[in-house]
Amino acid sequence: RTFAKKKGSGYLINGQKIWTSRAEHSDLLLLLARTTPIEKVKKKTDGLSVFLIDLRKISNKHIQIKPIRTMINHSTTELFIEDLYVEQNTLIGIEGEGFKYILSGMNAERVLIAAECIGDAQWFINQASNYANNRILFNAPISKNQGIQFPISKSYAHMKAAELMVHHAAEKFDSGINDGESANIAKLLAA
């Protein structure tokens, strides 16, 4: 839904994006926008371009950033872009090839998101354990009950298994192996 139209020595961008990570806390934004109308391309993924936008130089009237407050520890936003003019030098790579560039970074992003999810899980398990140990009912902490212990233990076991997969995927990435399977499994298990 975001289109960048050639204008002068640059592009005029209009549209909206949802599920954009950390835009409200960022100085720079990688923006994928359609530069060739969809009816003029063979595949839907053709005709997309990537732009590097310096948010510090953009007026709020051209980009509105609205937080989506649905997830703890994940600063997700929705962007509304209106008549944003950017120079040609903000284009990354070749016009129309942007989807390929974005795809090349997907595996790294999936491993990163999986690692964030592991951190979230550790925090929630710790919170649940502390609450169960400190909540006294009938003169004993509720953590003494199997009905409390088992779900926390099961969550911990799932988190540890996912953590191993995240480490495996990260090691492959660090070794220069672009392993989509490991990255996807890590994100699936950790999410």
Which residues are covered by each model-predicted region?
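Flexible, small-/acidic-enriched active-site or ligand-binding loops
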Residues: 57-85
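Short polar/acidic secondary-structure junctions
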Residues: 5, 36-38, 70-71
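Glycine-rich phosphate/pyrophosphate-binding beta-alpha loops
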Residues: 18-24, 71, 108-112
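Conserved hydrophobic/aromatic beta-strand scaffold that supports enzyme active sites
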Residues: 1-3, 10, 28-32, 50-52, ...
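Residue-level recognition of beta-strand microenvironments
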Residues: 7, 16, 20-23, 68, ...
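Cytochrome P450 core scaffold surrounding the K-helix E-X-X-R motif
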Residues: 90-95
